Each structure stands twice: as C-alpha cells, then as structure tokens.
Amino acid sequence: MALLKTSLDAPFTKIATGKVRDLYECVEFPDDLLFVATDRISAYDFIMENGIPEKGKVLTKISEFWFDVLKPHVQTHLITSRWEELPPVITKHEELKDRSMLVKKYKILPIEAIVRGYITGSAWKEYQKQGTVHGLNVPTGMKEAEAFPEPLFTPSTKAAEGHDENIHPDEVSKIVGPELAKQVAETSVKLYKIARDVALKKGIIIADTKFEFGVDETTNKIVLVDEVLTPDSSRFWLASDYTVGKSPDSFDKQYLRNWLTANNLANKPNVSLPEDVVEATRRKYVEAYEMITGKKWSY
C-alpha cells in the first residue's frame, strides 16, 4: 500500500507539502525539521492519483547513503534518518518508518544547483539549436549522451510562478552574493565528481543531478540540504547500456512518462496508474537502491 499523505497532530505542525515530501515543525525540537518522503509520484508537473509503494523509503535510504559518502566533503543538514535514532515522538508513528529525516533548519538558497556530466535532455536540445548549454560555450561536434570534458554547473532558480528558470552561472552571484555563489558552484561540481566516481564503480552513470543548499549563518558556509542523488533528483544510466549517440533509459520516472505519452495522458490531471506500471516503476527505484548501496532492498 502506497503512503500518499501524512497528517501528524500536535506537537507537530505541517509547514509545507511538496510533490513528494511533507515537512513538519515540532515544538520538542524547534531548531529542526522533520522531512517525510511519501510514495507520491509526479510527471509533467501533475501528481498521479496513486503512488508507488515504498518509493519514499527508497528515496530516503538512497539519500542516507549519499549523505554518509559526502559528509567528509560538505556540511549537511541531516541529523539522522535511522529509525532507532529518531525521538519517540516520531517513532510512535509507524507509518513514518524508513521514510523520515530529522534535519537542522537552515536558510535555504533559492538556487537549484544542477551539475551535468553528460549532454542529454534539455541540454542536448539547446545544444542542437544554439551550440551552447545554459548559454555556456561547449565543444563543437558533441554527440548525444557524450561526456563533457569537465562537468558543467548549470543552475536554475524558482521563477515567481513556481517554475524552474534556467540562469547563466554568472547570475547566481546577483541572487546570493559572490561568496556564496562561488561556494555553490565549486561544491556542486566537487560533490558530483565524488558521486560520479562512486556510482561508476557500481555500474551506474550519473548523467546529471540537482543539489540544493542552505547557509549556516553563523559561519556563512553552505550546507547540503534536501534529498541527495536520488532517482528523483538525478539522471542515472546503466553503464552497461551506455553508448555515445543515444541517451539510455534512466532509473527515474522515464518509464512512467513513456507510458503517459503512449496513452495520451501526458500533461493531464487525475491519472490513475495501472498495476503493471506501478510495479515496473517500483522495481526501477529498488534497482537503483540496490546497485548504488550494494545492499538488498529489505525495508
């Protein structure tokens, strides 16, 4: 059974509901937040009527893995996501098990820190038309899915109406100031390279990913927040499927998007997914977890 929504009573207060996560404050830990990853799934900006069982758990456990890998290299907001370490006020809610992260509150920077290691998706479309990626000059003659000589930092910001808006990297300093902009750009690429190398040894190519950062206002240092290197925030390819000239299928919602498109349901609300699509999508997420962590899915 997929968990589509949460509703925690006092001492919790729900402060935000995203496409996947519910965020809570709690009077017992006022400097922290509770992130709960539900099993909701969206495509083409619409949330499906039914979810993907265990998806929220997979996202949480993959993020947990990457926070552990990256914490020597960057400050993070994660206090714990391990059930046995969470306070009783949380663990008395059994439905939250393995899908909850207790995190420190930080001021969030209004930047989506996207790093691209390979030319695919919207970057490939722009390159075909203009020969650039996010307005950046890149080598001529590149083929689809080819690796860039060096990973590109291609940020976006939230426009007033809530849609992501691509911006040139130079624009970031106008939004957060030059010091934080430099930290975000350099740290994003550094973290991507570390994760890319870890994943490649496990048979996965991270084509691109999105990081989000807060700032520790006592030190003015950036802090890695939100989910990290999951199938929802990244494009994962099987290394065994990879050839330059064609983008492989990814471990994300591409299977779902393909089904919606084939059935003329893309960009339509209130879509219920058939059981075979739900299960095939669930398997994709679980496979990503098992390959990345090297562990059998058991949650």
Curated annotation (Swiss-Prot):
Annotated pathway: Purine metabolism; IMP biosynthesis via de novo pathway; 5-amino-1-(5-phospho-D-ribosyl)imidazole-4-carboxamide from 5-amino-1-(5-phospho-D-ribosyl)imidazole-4-carboxylate: step 1/2
InterPro entries: SAICAR_synt/ADE2_N, SAICAR_synth, SAICAR_synthetase_CS
GO biological process, one term: adenine biosynthetic process
EC number(s) recorded for this UniProt protein: 6.3.2.6
Catalytic activity: 5-amino-1-(5-phospho-D-ribosyl)imidazole-4-carboxylate + L-aspartate + ATP = (2S)-2-[5-amino-1-(5-phospho-beta-D-ribosyl)imidazole-4-carboxamido]succinate + ADP + phosphate + 2 H(+)
Uppermost EC category: ligase
A molecular function (GO) term: ATP binding
GO cellular component: cytosol; nucleus
Entry keyword set: ATP-binding, Ligase, Nucleotide-binding, Purine biosynthesis
NCBIfam families named in the record: PRK13961.1, purC
Family designation: Belongs to the SAICAR synthetase family.
UniProt-recorded name of the protein: Phosphoribosylaminoimidazole-succinocarboxamide synthase
Gene source species: Schizosaccharomyces pombe (strain 972 / ATCC 24843)
Lineage of origin: Eukaryota, Fungi, Dikarya, Ascomycota, Taphrinomycotina
Gene that encodes it: ade7
